[in-house]
UniProtKB/Swiss-Prot annotation:
Encoding gene, per UniProt annotation: ycbX
One GO biological process term: response to toxic substance
Domain (MOSC) ranges: 115-264
One Pfam family it belongs to: MOSC_N
Chain segments annotated as transmembrane: none
The protein, known as: Uncharacterized protein YcbX
InterPro entries, per database record: 2Fe-2S_ferredoxin-like_sf (IPR036010), 2Fe-2S_ferredoxin-type (IPR001041), 2Fe2S_fd_BS (IPR006058), Beta-grasp_dom_sf (IPR012675), MoCF_Sase_C (IPR005302), MOCOS_middle (IPR005303), Pyrv_Knase-like_insert_dom_sf (IPR011037)
Domain 2Fe-2S ferredoxin-type span(s) in chain numbering: 289-369
GO terms for MF: 2 iron, 2 sulfur cluster binding; catalytic activity; molybdenum ion binding; pyridoxal phosphate binding
Species in which this protein is naturally found: Escherichia coli (strain K12)
Amino acid sequence: MATLIRLFIHPVKSMRGIGLTHALADVSGLAFDRIFMITEPDGTFITARQFPQMVRFTPSPVHDGLHLTAPDGSSAYVRFADFATQDAPTEVWGTHFTARIAPDAINKWLSGFFSREVQLRWVGPQMTRRVKRHNTVPLSFADGYPYLLANEASLRDLQQRCPASVKMEQFRPNLVVSGASAWEEDRWKVIRIGDVVFDVVKPCSRCIFTTVSPEKGQKHPAGEPLKTLQSFRTAQDNGDVDFGQNLIARNSGVIRVGDEVEILATAPAKIYGAAAADDTANITQQPDANVDIDWQGQAFRGNNQQVLLEQLENQGIRIPYSCRAGICGSCRVQLLEGEVTPLKKSAMGDDGTILCCSCVPKTALKLAR
């Protein structure tokens, strides 16, 4: 029998999660889950994919707002009533909606921990975002779905294969189950926990975020556990690296640790295997040097040590991305002039394109979309 053994909410997207014994499960997700988010001033979302130290902030939801504790021990408090009353344009993964902006005082405090001006945003009294292809399902600041379920046995199987220590918190689930065999969740289509029925919509594709240590706020130097996942959990139909399942609730109710997870419907699982043959490039460390980078006519001084995606973002240049690990291909751009050091063989395309997340400038560059 499968059982719910852990419950998590993440009140602020990309910050530390909170374990619960019970929670209200609504169609939009668990109460207080990812209802706050850090953004650029223009509303573009910011996550620990870019700023790994975000996972060391501790959010504490209270009845009338949010208390935040930073890694240095300082703290701030904001009430729902203090947020702007006007809706502001906001974006997560290319979906555009509105949210409410926090007061200047807490935004200035938060900006001191980042290399840029940032804002805290709240979903507001009514969520304006919807799940793609599910237009009646409201969504918080979560990546794409209201719920993420993970299986303890699947984590154990991953740990047996992975040379690095792996914690469930690295995958940031809401619901953790035990009593099922490893990867059995791949076959689930409809489940019930307590009185709440969930549709299992799709597997959750994983990214560089899984390599961030929840305690240290640093990415694993060898890219684990994502590297190991790629070796046996790469979907053969689309190349996604999957761990866990995205869910949508059909109704509302309180769910509790210890509740039975009843499997109501199943379907054949996706086929998984290894990623393409060894993609690791031979890398020679370069002496520190500045390089000139031209992005579609916008020139700036960069360096030959940092991946191109991060350098472009530091200049306020928005490059689409998803995994930041050389898997999804979203950040591919045209290399018109110059040389780069690829961190993966697949980062260099035969058509003159490169993956920004997996290339470091070697000489002056000229780039375009």
